[in-house]
Amino acid sequence: MDEEILDYNEQKEGWVSKMVDWQKKHISDRQMTLILAFIIGLLASVAGYFLHGIVHEIQLLLTSGFNKGTYNLLFLLFPIVGIYLTMLFIKYVVRDNISHGITRVLYAISTKNSKLKAHNCWSSVVASGITIGFGGSVGAEAPIVLTGSAIGSNLGQIFRMDKKTMILLVGCGASAAIAGIFKAPIAGLVFTLEVLMVDLSMASLLPILISCVTATCFTYILMGSKSLFDFTLTSPWALDRVPACLLLGIFCGLVSLYFMRTMSACESFFAKLSPYPYVKLLFGGLILSSLIFLFPSLYGEGYSAVNVLLKGQNVEDWGQVMSRSLFYGHNQLLILYIALVTFTKVFATSATNGSGGCGGTFAPSLIIGGFAGFLFARLWNVNQVGVYVPEQNFTLMGMAGLITGVMHAPLTGIFLIAELTGGYQLFMPLMIVCISSLLTISIFESHSIYALRLAREGKLLTHHIDKAALTLLGMQDVIEKDYHPVGPDLPMSKLVSEISRSNNNFLPVLDQAGVLLGVIDITKIRHIIFRTELYQHFTVRQLMMQPSAVLTEHDSMDEVMQKFDKTDAAQLPVIDVAGVLKGYISRTRIYSMYRQIVADMSAE
C-alpha cells in the first residue's frame, strides 16, 4: 500500500513538473500570472460558497425550530459543542495552527517569501464553518482570506514564480476572497492595498482586478445577486448632518480602540491557558454561551441582526433584533440591549477564538460598527441633540467607521459599505465618518489590529520602501560562512598563514566547542604583520579583541542595521544562544542585497 502511494506521488510530481516545464517554454511568466489570477478568483469564490453553505446548513439544522418570542437554553450548549468539534478537527486532521488568518497572511508576505501551507487552501473553510455554524461569534472573512491567499501561494509555488510575483498572487487570493464573499470587487482591491499593504503598480493592478472581478462574477452565479445587507436609501444626505457625522467618526474611533485593546488583552489571557486546552475550552465556552443566551444577536456572524436595524422604520421593527432573548417584547429596553451587544461582542469574539474556535474579526468589526452607529443615532434622536439623523444611514456609516478604525483602512470601509448596499449616495458622509475615525484611532494606535502583532516584532512589510526592503531581507539571506576560524593559542606565525588564505578582514577566534572568544581584525594588526621578529612574542589570544557588537540568529534586519550604525563595524559575528558562531554579516553585503530588492520593488 505504501509503495502504491509513493508511486502515485512520484507520478503526480512528474506530471506537474512536465506541465511547469511546458509553461516556461510556451507561456511567459507575465501571461501565466494573468491566467493564475483568473484561476485564483474562481477557486476563491468556490471556497466562499462552500463556507457559506456549511454555516447556513448547520445554523438551519440547529436553530430553525426556535421560537423568536422566547429564550432557548440550547444557546448554552451549541457554541461549546462547535468549539469542541473545531478543536478536534484542528488537532487530529489539520495538526497545525490556523488562527489569525489575515495576520498569518501578513506574516507570510513579510517573512516567508509569501509561502503558505497547502492545507490552508481548505482547512480554515471547514474549521470556521463548524465554529460559526454552531454559534461562534466570529467572522468568515479572515478564514476565506487565508484560503484565497493560500491558493495563490501554492499555485505560485507550483509554477516556480519569483518572490515579487508570489506576493502578487497572495494579494490576488486575498482580494478575490473579499470581493467574492461580499460581492464587492473594488473593496477587494483596496483591501489588498490597505490591509495587506501590497504595493500596486500598473503591472500588478491588472491581475488583482482579474481575480476580484472573476470571484465576484462566479459568486453571483453560485449564490445569486442578493446583497448581504438589505438597505434602501430613504433619507438622502443633507449638509446639516455634518457635525453628527464627525462625532460618529470620533465615536467609532474610540470604539475601535476599545475593540483592539480588549481583544489584545483577552488574547494574552487565553494564551496563558494554552497548556490547559480543556480548561480554556470550558472557560471560554461558558463565557461565549452565556453571552449568546443573553444576547442571541451575538450568535454566529450576526449579519441578520444588522439587517433588522437596516430594514426597520420604528421601535417595533427594531425591537425584533431582541428576538429569542429575555429582552424580547420590552422595546423600551432597545437602547440598553443595543449598547450591551456593542460592548460585549468583543468578549464573545475573543472567547470564541481563545477557547479553540476558528474565525476572524472582520465580521465582528462590521457588527459592532453597525450597532454602534445605530446606538449613536438613536441616542441623538431621542435626546434631540440636533437635526434628525436617520438610524439606518448611521448604522451603515458606523460599519464603515469601525472597519476604518480597526483595520486602518478608510478606502475599504467606504467602498465595502457602498458596494454592499448600493448606497453610493452616502459617499460624502461615509468619507467624513471614515476620516474622523482614522484620525481618532491614529492618536492611540499606529497599526491595524492585524499588523499590530507583527509590527511589534519587526516583521511587518509596509508601504515605506526602505523599511519594506529591510523586512524582505532575512538573516539567512545575508549571513556569510566563508570564514577561517583560529584557536586562541595559535602562534602569530601560523596566524599570518591563515590571514593569507582569508578573503576578508574578519577572523573569528573559537574554542574547541565553537564558542566565539573574540575576533582578529586584520586592519588593527597590520603594523606588526610584516615584522617577523615579533612573531614569536605573540599568540592569537594576545592579538584578538572583543567584537564591538554581536548579532543573534533571531535579530530582525532593523536591529542588525541599528547595531551596524552604532558600531561603524564592517563585519559583525552571528552567534546562537550558546555563543556558538554561526557566521558573520558584512555591511557591504547588506547594502548590496538591499539595493537589489529596492530595484526589484521599484521595477514595473
Residue spans of the language-model regions?
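Structural signal for short hydrophobic segments within the conserved structured cores
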Residues: 482-486, 542, 547-550
